[in-house]
């Protein structure tokens, strides 16, 4: 009875000492002679966890803590106490804890961690560790010596995947995983470089890999399998693996790396896209650099004789002669340069709108008898030329006496000669508007009045397709003759003129460059020009609008390149001094011209990247169908004066790619059903 009271008093004391001391869930962990099952119950109650205790768990707990513990520390303390007494805690999926013997824990449903996952404390876990460079078959026995195999610890390995499974307390498992990580790194440095003098590194790797394949290769761990990498830049082979295997492979490589019986290595490379002549200079520069880096110590002339690069234009191919290492480098360069280059469709819109109003009113005076004139340069016609033309246009009458053979007077005959209107027509041809001539005695007045109203709206849409980084030029216009000089003969009997021709119209020059992200950089030179005034070879004036720029545009995006807005108000007046200033009457001695002009010019551009034949075919079909639709519209309207005439029309797009009659009939039948 006394023994029972004594035992109960100790249990009560342990319970009081382990109760929370504050609302912050701090615990005092001191137990003396407490039954282990009671100890487990106290901890479960304090942590509010459900704990299932194996019936084989028996004993007493003696432990003292002088510091208060928080909830996490208290749980770690609980695990450590059970570990000391040979028990372990296994947490199930539903959060319930099981307390069992340590040796039984490794066969229970304990947590499984892999990769960088980690656990702490004395919790029993299983860690999966992947080993890359060391054989797990050799590593496992070493690890078993560092773990409690009689308790919860255990180490097993799986050869095909070269992995290790470690079961035990979390702290011990973490320590073994760290040991594996450090040991596994040592294998990464076991790499040897074998330089080749004659053979090609890539070809040597292919041969050695074929010879190294054995019947038991599938059962060999990945770590023990040798690995080969060809470094074509230095023409060497990198070998990793077991030292004995590496040594055997090095001997094999040296036996194969011998000089060829026939010196020289010739190769003909047929190009698919690049131009052979363009690649010759590039390859010569590459080969010279490779020979300089190789540094064989041979004379410069000997080195150059080793490499020969020529282009065969008829077959668009390259003929190469070089040592194997340089040959491989040049073939790699050719493979990277001989690619299908993208194309760019450049569509431009040039919009020019102009309107103008003007009026001209003037009076000119002239006298044939005295030769006096009052004329102005802004009227378009000179009264002097008009007066001369009028005088030459008059009929002339002549009277002539007629005599017989004996010189006897018979009669007078009168003949009238028609006037010459050539001079008058030339003078009047330059008149615009209305011109009225009034004769007052010897003086003649020429009144000229004209009013003009002009408006134009010009839309030009040139388009051109060009290769990436290629230059394309486009011109639509005409060549205008311009006199550049004149020379007379020695006796002024054979004068001649030198004439140059100037291109006038719409010019477009583009160099596109496709950049990352389907953006296109465009270097553009654009010009719009036309002839001003009479279309002759003397005093020809040209109007030119030119734009030079470099822009970045997204694929399929339209961008405005520039514009010009020009407004002019012009007024000119020519008059006779003093007389032209007289009110009202002064209008008879002056010529006035007023003009208002307004021009708008805008240039837009849109690039479209064409990377394949499908895109090119779609763009071509769109343009083709547009022209064909215009022709069909005109054909439907017909010709006004030729009812029976037929208007030519393009065939349907794709008719040139028709199939055999049987297949084509089937396709047309299916299209008709749709």
From Swiss-Prot:
Site keyed May serve as a pivot that allows opening of the central gate for substrate egress: positions: 477
Region (N3): 264-338
Region (N1): 123-187
Residues covered by region (N2): 188-261
Keywords: Cell outer membrane, Membrane, Protein transport, Signal, Transmembrane, Transmembrane beta strand, Transport
Effect in UniProt of substituting residue 505 to A: No complex assembly
Annotated region described as S domain, given as residue ranges: 614-674
A molecular function (GO) term: identical protein binding
Region (Secretin): 343-612
Keyword Signal: yes
Signal peptide positions on this chain: 1-24
An example Gene Ontology biological process: protein secretion by the type II secretion system
Transmembrane segments: none
Record's subcellular location: Cell outer membrane
Comment field on protein domains: The N0, N1, N2 and N3 domains are periplasmic, while the secretin and S domains form a channel that is partially inserted in the outer membrane. The cap gate extends out on the extracellular side of the channel partially closing the channel. The secretin domain forms a double beta-barrel structure; the outer barrel has an outer diameter of about 110 Angstroms while the inner barrel forms the central gate with a small pore in the closed state.
Task of the protein: Involved in a type II secretion system (T2SS, formerly general secretion pathway, GSP) for the export of proteins. Required for secretion of cholera toxin through the outer membrane. This subunit forms the outer membrane channel.
Binding partners and assembly: Forms a cylindrical channel with 15 subunits; unlike E.coli no 16-subunit channels are seen. The closed pentadeacameric channels are 195 Angstroms long and 145 Angstroms in diameter. Each subunit turns in a clock-wise manner around the channel.
Name of the protein in question: Secretin GspD
Organism whose genome encodes this protein: Vibrio cholerae serotype O1 (strain ATCC 39315 / El Tor Inaba N16961)
